[in-house]
């Protein structure tokens, strides 16, 4: 665009198109994918079901969007075993995940008494 083009009147169609594109871009950025939380919840529930039986209504997934950051919240009510403790296999897996998150090496697979 030349300097003379700066002072030229734009057609109303071009202005409307630009405004609509701007509105759509803002709405897409605000809403994201509405089905994302539902899909994440289903996939997380399927993975957890491989290790322990969990009632689907006891799994809550939230996605909060902030300035440049999205936070995924996960709240799972795990059932207690007959002895009042988590299943040993699940407890070991949770400990391994927690250790890996901190940058530590996975714990050895020793059986607890």
From Swiss-Prot:
Keywords: Cell cycle, Cell division
Matching Pfam families: MinE
InterPro entries cross-referenced by the UniProt entry: MinE (IPR005527), MinE_sf (IPR036707)
GO BP annotation list: cell division; regulation of division septum assembly
Superkingdom, taxonomy of origin: Bacteria
UniProt function note: Prevents the cell division inhibition by proteins MinC and MinD at internal division sites while permitting inhibition at polar sites. This ensures cell division at the proper site by restricting the formation of a division septum at the midpoint of the long axis of the cell.
Family to which this protein belongs: Belongs to the MinE family.
NCBIfam families: minE, PRK00296.1
HAMAP family with a match to the protein in the record: MinE
Designated name of the protein: Cell division topological specificity factor
Species of the source: Methylobacterium radiotolerans (strain ATCC 27329 / DSM 1819 / JCM 2831 / NBRC 15690 / NCIMB 10815 / 0-1)
């Amino acid at each position: 665009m030349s300097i003379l083009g700066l002072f030229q009147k734009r057609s109303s169609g071009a202005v409307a198109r630009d405004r609509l594109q701007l509105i759509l871009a803002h709405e897409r950025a605000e809403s994201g994918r509405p089905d994302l939380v539902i899909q994440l919840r289903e996939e997380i529930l399927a993975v957890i079901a491989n290790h322990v039986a969990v009632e689907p209504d006891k799994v809550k997934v939230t996605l909060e969007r902030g300035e440049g950051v999205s936070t995924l919240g996960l709240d799972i009510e795990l059932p207690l075993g007959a002895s009042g403790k988590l299943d040993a296999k699940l407890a070991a897996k949770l400990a391994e995940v927690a250790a890996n998150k901190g940058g530590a090496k996975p714990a050895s697979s020793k059986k607890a008494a």
